[in-house]
Each structure stands twice: as C-alpha cells, then as structure tokens.
Amino acid sequence: MIKQVLLITALMASSVAHAGFYSGSALLSESEGYVKNKSGVATVAEAVNGGMFMGYIAGVFDTYAMQGNRNICPKAGLSVGSASDAVMQYLNEHPEQLNYSAPSVIMLALTATFPCERH
C-alpha cells in the first residue's frame, strides 16, 4: 500500500512542482493528510496528500543541499518525517507566512529548526 501511495505521489508531484504557485497554505492543507497517515487513519486521498507534503519537503531540502546551502545543519540521519514535523510545526506557529511560496516557508522552517553554529 505504501509503495502505491508513493508512486501516486511521485506522479502527482511532478505535475505540481513545475507550476511554482505552491504556497505555505497549500502545504499546510496537505499536512492534515500527513498527520492522519502517521496515526493510521488516513483515507487514500489523505495518504496521497501526506505523501505529497513529505515529498515536497524532501525535494526542497535536497535541492538546497545540492546547491551547498550552509544555513541548515541537521544532525546526521535526519529523516524526512522529522523534517516534515518541523515544517508542519513552523506552519502552525507562523500563519502570517502561509501566503509565502512553499519552498520559502520550508527553508525558513528548516533554518529555524536546524540552525548552523556560527564560529
């Protein structure tokens, strides 16, 4: 079942990612499916939304990591789930930023949660 959801998520995310109009508000909406999926009570549609939430966060994180971003310094072994939890918490605590682009909000959340030590 999880493999099927991930496949559907990957197919759907490919049509969303290039548009560039994905907002923090849309991300927060999909986090509801993520929460329900973690609890084991998600419908298929909610599980897909939860998978899209996690996949979008992982994609933004990986993109910035490949570009050599030095503002996010998670401990080794950070899971997509932990990053997703951090972003979801940030979205709930900063509703004034829901109109920001999803990548911007994700980077703000991860930078706040996993700051780098400055020497």
What are the residue ranges of the model-derived segments?
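N-terminal signal peptide c-region/cleavage motif recognized by signal peptidases
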Residues: S14-A17
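Sec-dependent signal peptide recognition
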Residues: M1-I8
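Compact alpha-helical subdomains of small soluble proteins
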Residues: V35, D62-H119
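Short N-proximal segments of mature Sec-exported proteins
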Residues: G20-S84
